[in-house]
Amino acid sequence: IEEQLEYIVEKYPCKSGIKTMFILGNHDYSHMRNAGFDIGKAVAKERTDMVYLGQDVADVNYGKTKIRLFHGCKGQSYARSYRMQKYVEQIPSYEKPHILLMGHYHNSFYMKYSDVYCFQVPAVIDQTPYARSLGLNNEKGAWIADFTTDKYGNIITMTPEFLDFTD
């Protein structure tokens, strides 16, 4: 655990004026379950530019626009859109975000569904031997989203750009 913490603190990019807001997922939770260690809290304590928002799900307000960070835990489905669609459908209307950033599946995908702009966030690591043995896809990359809003935070225009980090 200490090596992982040290690696994140030393290697994760740091740029003046930019904060990274992050959540943890199911693999990170294993540290909590097995050793009682919350690596998210430890990272945020060491890096003032990194804001830990908790485990699995968090909402961030960017002005009046609500952005939800969500880390799933189920396996990949037959279609990339399926898990996002089912997740958006179960969010109560009063809680619905304008933008959903969904991790865990190591794939990239973008769609607008039920008035939510949905991004499946890819991996930033190479495919693991375990994922390879299961025949799971692993895309490396990131999204940049350029959007405009009205005075209520509703999205008027959205221009997604995928950055492919494939070797």
Regions found by a protein language model. Give the residues of each.
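Short, solvent-exposed polar/charged micro-motifs at secondary-structure junctions
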Residues: M32-R33, N61-T65, L69-F70
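Charge-rich, low-complexity terminal tails
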Residues: L24-Y29, N34, T148-D167
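Short, well-structured alpha-helical interface segments that form or flank functional binding sites
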Residues: E3-Y7, N34, Q55, E95, ...
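Short acidic-hydrophobic surface loop/beta-edge motif
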Residues: D56-G63, M111-Y113
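Conserved beta-sheet core of the metallophosphoesterase superfamily
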Residues: K66-E161
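Residues that act as N-cap/strand-start positions at coil-to-secondary-structure junctions
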Residues: Y52-D56, E139
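Flexible, charged surface loops at secondary-structure boundaries
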Residues: C14-S16, N61, P92-K96
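Core catalytic region of metal-dependent phosphoesterases/phosphodiesterases
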Residues: I1-Y52
